[in-house]
Amino acid sequence: MPEFVTFSRNVFIPVTNICRNLCGYCTFRRDAGHPEAHLMSMSEIRPILERGEKAGCTEALFVFGEYAEEVPEYLLELEKLGYSTTVEYVADLCKLAIEIGLLPHTNAGILNRKELEILKPLNISMGLMLETTAELKAHSESPGKKPSTRIEMIRTAGKLKIPFTTGILVGIGETKDDRKRSLNTIADIHKEFGHIQEVIIQNFMPKPDTPMADHAPPSKEEMIDTVAIAREILPSDVAVQVAPNLIDPYSLIKAGASDLGGISPTTIDWINPEAEWPDVIELQKMIKEIELRERLPIYPQHIKKGWYSNNLSYLIETLTDKNGFKRKQR
């Protein structure tokens, strides 16, 4: 059992749910003509960030559908906001978050090297789920879920020294050997570049009105087994993360998990909207006798390495304690 388990406090901003991919399990994505399709404006986003900062959050999690620019209707909406590319808009949203006092973490799907270089100075960390190295039916209509494409981006982030979150999705048609291959791929990338902070072991949850609505989720035993395999395969400086709003974490902590990810006191989980976040008191009850320790969206080892830009130095100095974790409020 670990001495302590970590989490971060975030505000979850679903900037757009328009996406070029059509994954078999996703309820986040909307077609451009759907009444729930959106591109949030800065005036909508600012008060959400401000509420999060007042609630003690340290992370602004910006989530996007992938390459929405491929959808003409989205481009028109983006141009109304005064931008020609999503990355330009993300950069300004990150600046806004920093101004308010939050550390940006962007997960926008596939980004090329130039786009990562633009966002690196304005993000404390970034993320992209590998999901799996297997070619699956669930991803047959999702060009951005091609394993080689995702691996290339994770490697590019390593070359640029961007602290990074990735992970696998368990139960979408992959085999146990596929999971091992995926985890070994992540481990090899980290051994080369040293940038992967955490690997999420996320359990598939069937959603109504999706092609995989009747697909069974992984059992608790499968999840325990996968976490144990992850802890065995991954280097010791890479945390194994599980989502406490999707599964009871205690047995997974016993198997090797040590992080509970981002928890929001002010926003919902827009990817799994049916799964409410536990609050910090509930989190502590879930993990029983283990110490719960709050971290930032950058891990202490990457703070010590100085893997962040001058744009973020003041917030790092303000928010961290001497060990690189979240400074306790007095």
Curated annotation (Swiss-Prot):
- What CDD domains does the record tag this protein with? Radical_SAM
Example of a GO MF term: transferase activity, transferring alkyl or aryl (other than methyl) groups
Which PROSITE patterns is this protein grouped with? RADICAL_SAM (PS51918)
* Biological role stated in the UniProt entry: Catalyzes the radical-mediated synthesis of 7,8-didemethyl-8-hydroxy-5-deazariboflavin from 5-amino-5-(4-hydroxybenzyl)-6-(D-ribitylimino)-5,6-dihydrouracil.
Q: Which domain of life is it from?
A: Archaea
Tell me its family. Answer: Belongs to the radical SAM superfamily. CofG family.
Which is an annotated Pfam family here?
Answer: Radical_SAM
Protein's name in the database: 7,8-didemethyl-8-hydroxy-5-deazariboflavin synthase
Q: Which residues bind [4Fe-4S] cluster?
A: 19, 23, 26
Q: Which residues form the Radical SAM core domain?
A: 5-245
Keyword Lyase in the entry? The reply is: yes
Task: Give the EC number(s) listed in the UniProt record.
Answer: 4.3.1.32
Cofactor(s) needed by this chain: [4Fe-4S] cluster
Species this protein is from: Methanococcoides burtonii (strain DSM 6242 / NBRC 107633 / OCM 468 / ACE-M)
| Textual note on the cofactor | Binds 1 [4Fe-4S] cluster. The cluster is coordinated with 3 cysteines and an exchangeable S-adenosyl-L-methionine.
Catalysed reaction per UniProt?
5-amino-5-(4-hydroxybenzyl)-6-(D-ribitylimino)-5,6-dihydrouracil + S-adenosyl-L-methionine = 7,8-didemethyl-8-hydroxy-5-deazariboflavin + 5'-deoxyadenosine + L-methionine + NH4(+) + H(+)
Keyword Transmembrane listed? The answer is: no
Pathway assigned to this chain's UniProt record: Cofactor biosynthesis; coenzyme F0 biosynthesis
Quaternary context: Consists of two subunits, CofG and CofH.
Q: Could you tell me the keywords of this UniProt record? A: 4Fe-4S, Iron, Iron-sulfur, Lyase, Metal-binding, S-adenosyl-L-methionine
